Each structure stands twice: as structure tokens, then as C-alpha cells.
């Protein structure tokens, strides 16, 4: 019972904090009338609590046409290149895994090349004759506990806000529950490898589709890590405009597989 009381107090503090952030940023927006500036500040302040809240805000805003494509892409880039610090790296586990599986990290153990909401990404090379380049995807340290706390705060807030009629109009609870389930699936690395294998099998006859091959043994021993082959490519938002049509046709074919 004591734990539930503490949890509810934390959730109330979270709700009050978020309401203060939104309220203060709305006041600043009322003064400067700069929507892009408003989104930037709001994003950074939500991320300082938990990056998950940025993802939920993005889904809510997009679902209710509160942001345009340009702003949505900006938020996508933010969540795909999320802030991180050294406390997010489980250094002991990363060093132990790389030593056991003979992987060299040329940029060191404290320099990820990318940071998502759930994981940090490192470049590595196998210590053998092939010197094959690999990607090491590692969950942020204590991410499961942080996500659980964030989700509990959100669900508690949805319950409180459900008593306000205007909130129901924006289907906020539906957006939160949908995204919470998606995010929970992203923390299961064995399931992610299963999905990669399934897609690779389904697309084996599509020459233009390349799916990384993951070392399942690594993840079975270190559930917070995926080691996979590196594939050169570009992000979808980096595709030249004159290639949109041909790329779209390939995406449609891929979707039909």
C-alpha cells in the first residue's frame, strides 16, 4: 500500500509538472507568436523529463492535426537522435560482450553514433580476417524501469484528465494506449530479431530489399543488445525529390509482400 501511495504522489507531481510546462509555454507562445519556437521549447522540456513524452506529444499532435509535415519531421528527427548522457551506457555489459565476441569499437565504448528513445547505436568491427562492420544496438541503462515509470504516470494522468470533457474530444487516451503498446514491443530484442528474420524470408526474392542479419546468440546471452550486419543506405527523408516516384513504387511492392 505504501508503494502505491508513493507511486500516486509521483504521478500527481508529474501531471502538475506537465501542466505547468504546457501552460508556461502557451504563455510564451502568446507573447512571441512563433509556433516553431513553441514546439522546440516544449519538446526540449518534455524530453528533460522523459523522451517518451515527446513521442506521445508527437502522436497526439499529429492525430489532431496540430502540427504540419515539416514540424512532424522535425520531431521525428528529434526522437531518432534523442539526447543522451554517459549514464545511459551500460559500460560493463558493452565491454564484456565485445570482448567475448571479439568486436572492436573504433570510436570507443562511450561514443554512440546515434541515440533513439530506447537504444544507443554503436559501430563495431569483427576481430577476424573479414573485419566485417557491424551495428551494436544497446538499450539505454535502466530504460525498462524509466519506461514503466513514464507509462504509469501517463496512465494515471489519462484517468484524471478523462473527467474533463474537452480532453475526450481529442482521443488522448486512445493515442497514449496505442503508442504505449508499440513502445513496449520495441524493448523486446528477441522479438525484434524474429521480425527481422520473418521480413528477410518474405522479401528474399526482392533484390532491392536488404534486411540486416542479427547474431541471435548475442541477444540470447545479452538481452539488452543486438549485434547485426551493417548495411549502407540513407534515411527516407534524405531521398532526392526526383526519386520519390520510383522509390514509392518499390515501397508499395514491399508492402504487398
Briefly describe each language-model feature range.
Residues 1-256:
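Broad phosphate/nucleotide-binding scaffolds in NTP-utilizing and phosphate-metabolizing enzymes
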Amino acid at each position: 500500500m505504501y508503494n502505491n501511495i508513493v507511486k500516486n504522489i509521483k504521478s500527481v507531481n508529474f501531471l502538475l509538472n506537465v501542466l505547468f510546462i504546457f501552460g508556461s509555454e502557451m504563455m510564451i507562445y502568446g507573447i512571441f507568436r512563433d509556433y516553431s519556437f513553441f514546439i522546440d521549447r516544449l519538446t526540449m522540456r518534455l524530453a528533460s523529463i522523459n523522451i517518451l513524452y515527446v513521442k506521445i506529444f508527437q502522436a497526439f499532435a499529429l492525430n489532431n492535426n496540430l502540427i504540419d509535415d515539416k514540424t512532424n519531421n522535425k520531431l521525428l528527427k528529434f526522437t531518432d537522435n534523442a539526447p543522451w548522457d554517459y549514464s545511459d551506457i551500460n559500460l560493463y555489459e558493452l565491454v564484456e560482450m565485445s570482448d567475448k565476441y571479439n568486436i572492436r569499437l573504433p570510436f570507443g565504448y562511450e561514443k554512440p553514433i546515434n541515440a533513439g528513445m530506447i537504444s544507443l547505436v554503436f559501430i563495431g568491427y569483427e576481430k577476424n580476417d573479414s573485419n566485417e562492420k557491424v551495428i551494436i544496438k544497446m538499450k539505454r541503462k535502466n530504460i525498462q524501469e524509466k519506461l514503466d515509470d513514464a507509462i504509469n504516470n501517463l496512465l494515471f494522468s489519462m484517468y484524471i484528465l478523462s473527467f474533463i470533457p474537452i480532453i475526450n474530444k481529442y482521443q488522448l487516451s486512445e493515442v497514449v494506449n496505442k503508442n504505449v503498446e508499440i513502445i513496449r514491443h520495441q524493448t523486446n530484442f528477441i522479438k525484434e530479431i524474429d521480425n527481422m528474420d520473418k521480413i528477410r524470408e518474405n522479401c528474399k526474392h526482392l533484390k532491392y530489399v536488404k534486411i540486416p542479419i542479427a547474431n541471435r546468440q548475442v541477444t540470447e546471452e545479452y538481452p539488452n543488445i543486438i549485434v547485426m550486419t551493417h548495411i549502407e543506405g540513407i534515411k527516407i527523408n534524405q531521398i532526392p525529390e526526383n526519386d520519390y516516384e520510383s522509390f514509392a513504387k518499390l515501397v508499395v511492392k514491399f508492402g504487398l509482400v
